[in-house]
């Protein structure tokens, strides 16, 4: 159907500078499969702002920061479509996909690259629950761990990760 929740966090040097979280009224019924996966019900989004109303505050919160996500292109495709429908410019921020990075750095340790599998295996502080902010915080934990692991490839921070072959991305 459409976006039902937005979550974001800003980090600098591993420190969380702030978070943004809101339910979003998708303007249509929520399929039962989404409710089973996320726990989000129609009553939870009743009265919530539309994505059209949320986009300006999300864009302001994000600014020109690098966007990090697990399968980030999937999430960005929803935001890009929402921006198009709202008559807004799409996000043009650089992006890093922790799924692609995990495949490269953890490929021999894990049966798959699902965020939940990785979070359990690595005992991340935050566990993903298919809820926006939980997944954001788990992804941030994963990124920080992967930055440490990427040191063997000569990367010492996010800017270096963007320069690694097959790690750089643009929405």
Regions found by a protein language model. Give the residues of each.
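Conserved non-catalytic scaffold segment of RNase H-like nuclease domains
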Residues: 1-93, 108-130
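Short Asp/Glu-rich motifs
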Residues: 54, 102, 138-139
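A charged, well-structured terminal subsegment
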Residues: 126-145
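Short, solvent-exposed coil/turn elements at secondary-structure transition points
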Residues: 14, 25, 101-104, 164-167
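Conserved beta-strand -> loop -> alpha-helix junction used to position metal-binding or nucleic-acid-contacting
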Residues: 89-103
């Amino acid at each position: 159907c459409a976006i039902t929740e937005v979550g974001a966090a800003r980090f600098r040097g591993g420190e969380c500078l702030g978070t943004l979280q809101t339910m979003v009224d998708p303007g249509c019924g929520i399929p039962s499969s989404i409710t089973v996966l996320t726990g989000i019900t129609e009553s939870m989004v009743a009265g919530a702002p539309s994505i059209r109303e949320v986009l300006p505050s999300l864009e302001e919160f994000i600014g020109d920061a690098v966007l990090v996500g697990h399968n980030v292109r999937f999430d960005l495709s929803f935001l890009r479509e929402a921006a198009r429908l709202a008559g807004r410019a799409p996000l043009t921020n650089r992006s890093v996909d922790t799924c692609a990075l995990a495949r490269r750095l953890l490929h021999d340790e894990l049966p798959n690259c699902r965020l939940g599998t990785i979070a359990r295996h690595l005992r991340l502080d935050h566990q993903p629950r298919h809820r926006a902010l939980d997944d954001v915080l788990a992804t941030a934990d994963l990124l920080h761990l992967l930055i440490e692991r990427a040191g063997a490839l000569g990367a010492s921070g996010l800017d270096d990760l963007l320069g690694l072959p097959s790690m750089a991305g643009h929405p």
